[in-house]
């Protein structure tokens, strides 16, 4: 069985230090993979997850997954680097394919690509895009 853990690029504690240290620790402990999430904005409204509520005392940054994955690749040597998931409608598909292929080559074949269609209306609104599903 292969076991992976999340990199906190969009969850607490989303900090450069955590994005640096969590994958290194996971690699040293023998985990198979680390996984990055993808969100553009935090949704606001009655249907948002509890941890995003405006009344929450917690705030954190949302680090871009491709950039974070490059950072992880540069600071590790063997652990697989997964996207769980990369939201394709937010990105140009040709540029995304090139970026993922480049990352996979630069990391010596360590990339696992998971893709999705997105589900938060606020993110599509922030990008001035229709939500087509």
Give the role of each language-model region.
Residues 67-74, 80-88:
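Structural motif corresponding to the early beta-alpha repeats
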Residues 27-28, 70-78, 100, 104-111:
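Acidic (Asp/Glu)-rich catalytic clusters
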Residues 2-15, 86-133:
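Flexible, glycine-rich active-site loops centered on histidine and acidic residues
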Residues 1-75:
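N-terminal beta1-alpha1-beta2 module of alpha/beta enzyme domains
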Residues 35, 80-82, 114:
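Conserved beta-strand positions in the central sheet of alpha/beta enzyme cores
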């Amino acid at each position: 069985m292969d076991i992976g853990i999340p990199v906190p690029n969009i969850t607490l504690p989303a900090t450069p230090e955590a994005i640096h240290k969590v994958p290194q620790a996971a690699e040293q402990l023998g985990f198979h993979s680390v996984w990055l999430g993808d969100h553009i904005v935090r949704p606001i409204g009655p249907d948002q997850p509890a941890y995003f509520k405006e009344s929450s005392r917690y705030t954190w940054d949302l680090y871009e997954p491709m950039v974070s994955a490059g950072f992880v690749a540069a600071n590790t040597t063997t652990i697989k680097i997964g996207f769980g998931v990369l939201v394709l409608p937010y990105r140009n598909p040709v540029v995304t394919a090139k970026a993922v292929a480049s990352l996979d080559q630069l990391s010596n074949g360590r990339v696992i690509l998971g893709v999705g269609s997105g589900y938060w209306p606020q993110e599509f609104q922030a990008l001035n895009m229709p939500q087509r599903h």
